[in-house]
Amino acid sequence: MDQKQLQALVEQISIRVFGKPFRHTAFFNPRLRTTGGRYMLQTHNIELNKKHYEQFGEEELIAIIKHELCHYHLHLEGKGYRHRDRDFRELLQKVGAPRYCRPLARNTKAPKTIYTYICTSCGLTYRRKRRINIDRYVCGRCRSKLKLS
């Protein structure tokens, strides 16, 4: 789905579900990580997370659009547009929009390598995330050389 298709979809949902036009811009924001979308109060634009569309499909995207359009229309009408406001919760139920979006599958990072250094004299061990120059650093207890194990 590209920008024009997304804009047309948001405008269509706004007319069909809310009976009011959407006169601003809706677009995919690649910087969004944990949220499905957001409504910008200053510009009245709606930003959506493309990863939700790719992972869960168009149904989930439509649900997120409905949620953000609830924020949009209530804010423009001067009513309570925040999650905690009664107007917002009632409109969510009326249009069948979810209160929260489904969580994305996390990309787990590979565990970082832990470097273990052992003192050649007293045997004290040092565990570090970063590699150190063993020619420059010595044991803090006995001042002997360190060895990477």
Curated annotation (Swiss-Prot):
Residues where Zn(2+) binds: 67, 71
TM region positions: none
Annotated GO MF terms: zinc ion binding
An example Gene Ontology CC term for this record: cytoplasm
Protein's UniProt keywords contain Electron transport: no
InterPro entries documented for this protein: SprT-like_domain, SprT_Zn_ribbon, Uncharacterised_SprT-like
Catalytic residues identified in the record: 68
A biological process term (GO) from this entry: response to stress
Keyword NAD among record annotations: no
Cofactor(s) listed: Zn(2+)
SprT-like domain location: 6-147
NCBIfam families assigned to the protein according to its UniProt record, in alphabetical order: PRK04351.1
Protein name: Protein SprT-like
